[in-house]
């Protein structure tokens, strides 16, 4: 009987707790997100989305990044989905911990511009990678210091 009561308590606890979460997804599930994707997501119960800025950055000419971000915003708005978070762009080269000070400054400046653009989405949080891996043990401490300083 004690086991049955314990199991019932656990099920009720989990079910009650699970009800606190809303359904969300990420733009990264679609290779090239279209407005129809967001409308379908909304119709199936998705309330929140994380915007993957890499979709607007990777392999894209620099002058097309901002227009693509604005286009992504319009598509999300058309479905009335709330942006929960923005996953800022990252790569082995777009890294705020690199040892080359000139390149690090360029990366930080670019990232600052991306963070400013996030304001139009009104996200709850941002995801920023402080570095990329792998990092050799011999330079790890300096890379951590650079990421912190950036």
Each PLM stretch: what is its role?
Residues 18-22, 84-96, 131-134:
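N-terminal small/glycine-rich loop or linker at the start of catalytic domains
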Residues 19, 37-46, 63-86, 112-122, ...:
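Acidic (Asp/Glu)-rich catalytic clusters
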């Amino acid at each position: 009987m004690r086991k049955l009561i314990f199991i019932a308590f656990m099920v009720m606890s989990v079910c009650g707790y699970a009800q606190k979460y809303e359904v969300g997804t990420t733009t990264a599930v679609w290779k090239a997100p279209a407005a129809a994707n967001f409308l379908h997501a909304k119709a199936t119960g998705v309330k929140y989305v994380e915007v993957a800025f890499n979709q607007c950055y990777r392999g894209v000419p620099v002058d097309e990044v901002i227009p693509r971000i604005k286009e992504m915003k319009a598509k999300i708005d058309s479905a009335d989905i709330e942006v929960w978070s923005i996953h800022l762009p990252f790569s082995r080269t777009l890294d705020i911990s690199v040892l080359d000070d000139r390149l690090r400054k360029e990366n930080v400046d670019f990232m600052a511009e991306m963070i400013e653009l996030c304001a139009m989405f009104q996200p709850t949080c941002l995801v920023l990678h402080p570095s990329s891996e792998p990092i050799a043990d011999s330079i790890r401490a300096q890379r951590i210091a650079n990421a912190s300083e950036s």
